[in-house]
Structures are given as structure tokens and as C-alpha cells.
Amino acid sequence: MELLYTPTALKRLKTIGAKDIPKVKRKIQSIQQNPQLGIPLQGILKGKRKLVAWPLRVIYSFNSDTQQVIIETVDYRGSVYKK
């Protein structure tokens, strides 16, 4: 699968603490290998999935037709669902 990042995701990744970066990278690699791994979201985020890299959430979508995984954002639980 091709991995793409939104501008928001790239911006958020730059603000994550150094101790959380390895966890997030591992989760993103696992998403790339198996995009259906995450939990489907509801409401305004319907069509997207989340994967927890505690204490962060990786919000992403994937298109099986184009074989693309799009990392939408990475943020802490209290903030990620407000965007």
C-alpha cells in the first residue's frame, strides 16, 4: 500500500514528543501492512479508522481501489476527535 500524509498529519507529527515517535511509527507501519487493522469511526469521522499508539491516536483512511493509506492526523485522545 502507498502511504500518504495530509498536511495536518505532517504538522502534528512534528509536535509529538520524542518518546512517542517510535510507537507512532510502528503503528503506521502496521497500518500500511494491514489497513483494516484499525477500528472504524462513526459520526463526522465515518469512513475513517483509528489506531491507538497510547497516548496518541492515528486517524487514517484507505482506498482499496487505489491501494492508498492516508494518514489524516495524529493527536492525543482529547484533541483528535474535535478536528
Map each language-model feature to its residues:
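A short, surface-exposed loop/turn module that caps and links secondary-structure elements
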Residues: Q29-V52
